[in-house]
Amino acid sequence: MKFRDLGLAGLSGAQYFDPMYQTFDSKSEPELGPARLTDLQAVMRAEGLDAYIIPHSDQYQGEYLAPRDERLAWLTGFTGSAGFCVALADRAGVFVDGRYRVQVRSETRAPFVPVDWPETSATAWIKDNLPKGIVGFDPWLHTVADIDTMTRELTGTGITLRPCDNLIDRIWIDRPAPVTGKAFVHPIDYAGRSHTDKCRDIALDLRTARDAAAVLTMGDGICWLLNIRGSDIVHNPVIQAYAIIHDSGCVDLFVDAIKVTDVMDHLGDQVVVRPIDTFLDALAALTGQVRITAATLPRAAYDQMIAAGITLRDAVDPTVLPKARKNKVELDTARECHLRDAAHMCEFLCWLDAQNPDETTEIDVAIGLENIRRRDPMLMELSFDTISASGPHAALPHYRVTTATNRTLRHGEVMLVDSGGQYMDGTTDITRTVAIGDQPLAVKQAFTRVLQGVIAISRLRFPRGIEGRHIDILARQALWSAGQDFAHGTGHGVGHFLCVHEGPQGISRKSAVPLETGMIVSNEPGFYQEGSFGIRIENLIVVRQSPDFQGFLEFETLTYVPIDRRMICVDMLAETERIWINDYHKACRDNIEPRLSQETSVWFARMTAPL
């Protein structure tokens, strides 16, 4: 269905596009998995391996992968953004966390066996299923920390790890070609600081720690440092590269030269571009103490430096915290970016409300939202494939609609839309769950409990030093009181025209990083009733100094889009919660209403009316 068929032609200034930033083709081929596993097992036998590990990772250890690096999906059929597989001689375990436990069952076939992770670790499962033997792994796809942990846990079991070439690459005949996207400059008007200043600061950090150099392998950190962006990974404006930053502030950038021809003048003499296949030799030639990050450094790079006798010090990647602490320019431009995106969302939600559910599909919804966002000249990409999930599909936290799964909206169901844009001046991520017709009381009650979690985080004031894991419970307490919960974190860090998932900060049971001023995180509790419905409400928030109490922090909300008041059980709310919702909707009116079309303004006034 074309965009102009969706009833959006009357929107002021509308343009018409076919979808460009996302597709709806099915990426899962579960029916091919068993035969591919048989081919892998034959190669394993030839190599003398009893098991082989296939992670969801690439040689740069990013969360999101280029098509040629989707080895886990190619082998198993599982298309989630996190997980791994352990292949044995007669079966294979596919390890996924709570976000994907329903999805993995529909995307894999025997002899693949879904395994709940992290409740069951890879080593525990291997020990239970392999009395003794050799486990192979590609040292480019596993970090130093991963292999150290597994080695320690397998000590004394008769099971050993062996690095080897990638076995999937041997049997993946039609593997996609490498990406060749071009890097471009991220202007200082949005970045806030020059790359020379950033390099100078990190060089000082290295000298203070007596590190001669630091090895950088994460694309978002390298792009942030050098004020460049790329298109090597869909929806993530990064380049695939390695870098070494020296204590002088000079940088060796290891990348395919064709990718950076347009940014050479910007990089200047301080950055030396080198062929990516010289990276290992450059590591072996380093002198002095070298900073690495065991949690992200590929084991292959580590082994090369150890063999060369390099003195290594494990510490946090020096770009991680400065990147997470957004500067004033980044925050100011992000605020403007979020206001524009909120207006786009309101235009979309108004349109969605006016549709006949019986004539509207999940793909229609995703196309309609994308095309509204694409009227914004600052939009560069989506920040991820839109989660356009109706009815039972909304119970899959990371559902991706395809032509095979596409369903029509129905009265009496909810519609969950999780989406975002990559703009030159910021990255957005927002989820709204809306009513399609009247809702059962149980659904509205669950929605209200999720909303209470959003409010609890939003209103929080806390002392410096508090970590994300210390406050995660606040987003769950209303759900817990009803015996309900959600199997994902409450929030993740968000980049600035970078990856929509950015560390090190977050709000979850595992997040042990103190929250600091300038850090942007999502606030997105949810509830999922398998086979029936799902609810998630997500705003982005930024940590700031409390104006009232010295030494205390609080959250500033960046996202101003109405929360569906038709889904709220007002009698479940405390007075402070009702006031928060009314104040939030007033802030929506103050910030967004002037940006809306006349038609949407009428809808907007109704949706932001006081409770």
For the regions a protein language model found, what residue spans apply to each?
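Active-site neighborhoods and metal-handling regions in enzymes and metal-associated proteins
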Residues: F3-L611
